[in-house]
A protein has these predicted regions:
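Thiamine diphosphate
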Residues: 1-262
Length: 262
């Protein structure tokens, strides 16, 4: 806004108009970046995303904040745990879920002008794991460590809890292999399949409804593999009606190191 004032438009609380306006800019050859709170820029604008962007085959970038229950105390209107499911269902879309500054910076630069509609789901929390620049590639998952007993596939800030759980599991003689996913669509299927062949057990962890999110993508990836067990940890097809902070809601639905271990 300060550096390029002629490239910044505040549309106000008119998210659907904002989406259609941005699609018009894209049709005129520009590259729009559309920003708002997650439920308002995805669920409220779904028809405009479908008809004005995806059906027209134009590219752009949706950057949301306040994913899942980041705005915990504001209730259901500000919660959003089905956005990935909604956007993923549309052709010509890409979904990126970065949980650190370096991921967002590099993945935005890698994808912002590739003629696809890219949805960036930015969480309020972030993990503390330090990635090198060469580890972060669009469409490629990251194997955090080698393991042999179970594959844990994590997305978003829950990587933090997974790494804490990993430490405790190793103390019990269990060797987890941790895979971190920042690109939900397209998913790095080869990495997940290779790990599942080795361990035979896969657990997905996500701040999203287990229907339609990372868990479903992993399940579809593994559907033709015999002898692989899959478990899912996330929002279990329900509304979050508990009142509290982000951490308190995580505790209530098992998105904790203890919940992962159990």
């Amino acid at each position: 806004k300060e550096k390029y004032p002629t490239r910044f438009y505040n549309i106000g609380i008119c998210e659907q108009s904002m989406m259609s306006l941005s699609a018009g800019l894209a049709l005129a050859g520009l590259i729009p970046v559309i920003h708002s709170i997650t439920p308002f820029v995805t669920e409220r604008c779904f028809e405009q995303i479908k008809d004005d962007f995806c059906y027209q085959g134009v590219g752009g970038n949706i950057v949301s904040v306040g994913s899942c229950f980041d705005y915990a105390g504001l209730g259901c209107t500000h919660h959003c745990y089905s956005d990935i499911a909604a956007i993923k269902s549309l052709p010509r879309t890409q979904i990126i879920y970065p949980a650190s500054e370096i991921e967002f910076d590099l993945l935005m630069k890698q994808t912002y002008n590739n003629n696809r509609l890219t949805y960036f789901r930015l969480p309020q929390k972030k993990h503390s794991y330090k990635f090198s620049q060469d580890q972060i590639k669009f469409g490629k998952g990251i194997k955090i460590n080698e393991g042999k007993d179970i594959t844990i596939v994590a997305a978003g800030p829950q990587l933090e809890n997974v790494l804490k759980a990993k430490t405790e599991l190793e103390k019990e003689g269990i060797s987890p292999e941790v895979i971190y996913i920042h690109t939900i669509k397209p998913l790095d299927k080869d990495l997940i399949i290779a790990s599942a062949k080795k361990t035979g057990i896969v657990l997905t962890i996500e701040e999203h409804n287990i229907i339609g999110g990372l868990a479903d993508e992993v399940a579809r990836t593994l559907e033709d593999m015999e002898g692989v067990r899959l478990s899912r940890l996330g929002v279990n097809d329900r509304f979050i009606t508990d009142y509290g902070t982000y951490d308190e809601i995580c505790n209530s639905i098992g998105l904790t190191p203890e919940g992962i271990i159990s």
